[in-house]
Amino acid sequence: MSHLDLTRHRTRSPSPSQIFGSSTTPVATNSTHSEPSASSILRSILGEYADPKRPDVSGADPIRCPVKRVHKTPAVRASSPGRENVPVRTLQSSKDAEGDNFSGDGQLTPCGGPRPLAERLSPKLLAKQTRRKGVGAQKRTKGCDLVDRILTGRSIKASATAASKSSDLPQPQRKGIPTLVKEANPGEADWEDEGLQLEPATKRKYSWTPVKDTNLSIIDLTANSGSSPPSIPGREAQKFTSLVSRYGFAETSPLAMKNEFPEDFPTRKRQLDLLQGTTNSSSSEGSSNKSSGKCPLKVNGTKGRRSRKVTTITSLSTAQYGLKDSPVESFPSVDTTERPSGKRSKSQTKKGGNKKPAGVSDFKVAPTTDALKSLEDQVYLFGTSSQLERVSSDEDKLGVPSAPASSRQSARDRTSVSTLSKYKVSRNLWAAGWRDLDGSVADIEIVDMVNIDTPKSHESSTLTLPSTSTNASNQGFSSQNTINDRSKPSQTTSTTTESTGVESGQLVVPSLCEDLSEKAGYPAVPERETLSSREIASSESAYIETMPSFRGFTTAELAQKVAAFGFKPIKSREKMISLLEKCWQSQHKNSAPTSLPANNANPPDSHASGQKNVVRCDTGGSNASHTTKRASKAPQKKQSTSSTSHSAKAGPKQVDCSQERPNHAYLPHDSTQASSQPVIVIPDSEESGDDFQDTYLGSLNRTSSTNYHPLSANSIPDGSPLFLRTISQASTEEKTSDPSDINQQITRAIKAQPRMTAINGMKRPTWLEKILMYDPIWLEDLTVWLNTEGLDRVGEDREVSRLTVREWCESKGICCTWKKPT
């Protein structure tokens, strides 16, 4: 079976118009320059086997496909600007006879011979064809599509490729079949086989990393051995030591900059450094310069840099830490001062007038130690004006002389610190406030409060009681009502002494007549037993070790003692007292704590006789001088009982007025005054006259660490009946108790106050709620509430003053104020 028969029996394949569709733009057949189409290629291959009576349809069965004639008109180009190169669609005529196909230009189609165009096209059809401007897909007939199209592009069918392969075989040429398609140019037919003949594209670089050297380098690991590997031509073998040597430590950096300047080349910057480097490099030149006697500076032609005068504080402070750069001094020479005599003479004359005297030295910054010493000598004022040292207002009012300047100076000397101590302490808030009166850091020393000297204000505080010889029968005195002093060691007979002196810490209470005691209505003082000398000696030694009563001191004295311990001034009196008590306890913590003798604190004996005695002070008579003796010394011997009773009978005005240590005696104007009235040191102008007098007298009754000073007779006004009255049992217990617990009682009373109900929707907060809400506390209202209701809730019978309440508020950090007078 031939190749033609095989192609006829194949399955019918689509026509070129069906493959490319209407998307392919047809080109006129009579165009001058066009690309070969698929149909022309197929005709060139199957030219000898093509049947003239059958249409040229690629891949179509010629037997089954009916033959129709197609009349083609010349391509009419559209006149519109957008359709210059678009041909008009060809028309098909169904009236044509079978077997006649003509192309548009009159050529013979494969199905028939050439026929004239006028016979096949009527004028009406020709006019209708020219009116059409759009180009669409050709109308399909019932048979095969016989339109010959010239395709654009370079697409090649797979069937054409297979046919081209089969065309290479020798095929017999049939007679009677004319050749319809001319052969194409040989250049146009070979482009498919040869390709586009473009240059190959360069390989794209995805990174700019340098190309690695793929050449192998031979490393000689056996450098010491005699055998060596064969060397590669053009490259020497590298040793392993040379490769590792680059990772070793190099004493001299290879990147060090070398001196590019010659030795004689002068530079403007870093002249001294360059000179020093050049002179050190060549020692031979230095020796030659020394031999010639000229300085290398002069040989090189460079001038030495003059040192600039220091004029700023920064340069002065950093001068001692700077490096001294003086290379000229390393080359001493006699001829170094020789310079050309022209300009040098003028400069020397100018410098001669500006020379300073030899004795005057340049100003230099003092060393650190000298600066610290100078700071020690400066006077600092630390704190506000209220904290500076000044005389208290209490001393001005009461007329108490201030402490001597020597004691203040000694206190300052004790608080002096070392030179560098203030720079060694830790810098915190406590260190900043821990200052003494001089402003330096406080250095606390232990002060001996027992052996302290007696102040001058207390030296002449002995009360002298003169005695006169009068008839004892007129006054009704009896020798049986004599009350012996319990502090007397013994009773001896002495008739030469006519007056009795009262020592510090001793009490002399003579007996008084019964009728006066009955008229006055004062409680009687029962007779007490006489103590032996051994008991009194033990009581004196025990009293020396007891704590002094700081509450009898004035505020100014307390402030001085607090300053003596090295503390800063404290406003609160209670705080100063508690601080002094703690300081005294810390000094005597090694010794066993001892209390006052029992005979000094006990109330009057209940087993005494029911005799009533009234003590009246005598303001007349002669004065006798007596010396004050310290309590540490042995007490003097007193008069015998007979002499004491005789002096008591001598006159009606002879009285020994004294006060017992725990039981303070009051000198009231009014007999109805309460005996348990507390003593307030700071007077208040708003208080009554009786309270102010008690305060004034209580402030004068001060105690020291070793002795007690009773009331002076000069401070008692004349012409007023003053009576001594002993204190009852209740008042004694109240006085002996520590008044510092009154602050605790105030705190308990405020916390114990119950919550109050609201009135008409208005809440009534308690004192504790007001304090917690930082409301201002009226001192008058709080004092009235404490005295009427608050202290009664905690079982406290004492009353507090407004000053006490104010001190309590300040100690707790409570906002308090006085009411404004209306």
Swiss-Prot record:
Q: Where is the composition biased (Polar residues)?
A: 13-39, 310-320, 471-484, 589-612
Q: Where is the composition biased (Basic residues)?
A: 342-354, 627-636
Q: What's noted about post-translational modification?
A: Phosphorylated in response to DNA damage.
According to UniProt, the name of this protein is Structure-specific endonuclease subunit SLX4
Which GO molecular function terms does the record list?
5'-flap endonuclease activity
Annotated Gene Ontology cellular component terms: Slx1-Slx4 complex
Subunit structure comment from the entry: Forms a heterodimer with SLX1.
Q: Which family does it belong to?
A: Belongs to the SLX4 family.
Under HAMAP family, the record lists: Endonuc_su_Slx4
Main localization category: nucleus
Q: Which organism is it from?
A: Coccidioides immitis (strain RS) (Valley fever fungus)
Q: Where is this region: Disordered?
A: 1-39, 73-117, 277-362, 390-418, 456-507, 589-676
| Residue ranges, compositional bias (Low complexity) | 280-294, 460-470, 490-506, 637-650
User: Which superkingdom is the protein from?
Assistant: Eukaryota
Q: Does the keyword Phosphoprotein apply?
A: yes
Q: Give a short account of what the protein does.
A: Regulatory subunit of the SLX1-SLX4 structure-specific endonuclease that resolves DNA secondary structures generated during DNA repair and recombination. Has endonuclease activity towards branched DNA substrates, introducing single-strand cuts in duplex DNA close to junctions with ss-DNA.
Q: Name one GO biological process term.
A: DNA repair
Show the Pfam families listed in the entry: Slx4
Keyword list (alphabetical) reads:
DNA damage, DNA recombination, DNA repair, Nucleus, Phosphoprotein
- Compartments where located: Nucleus
The keyword RNA-binding is annotated on this UniProt entry: no
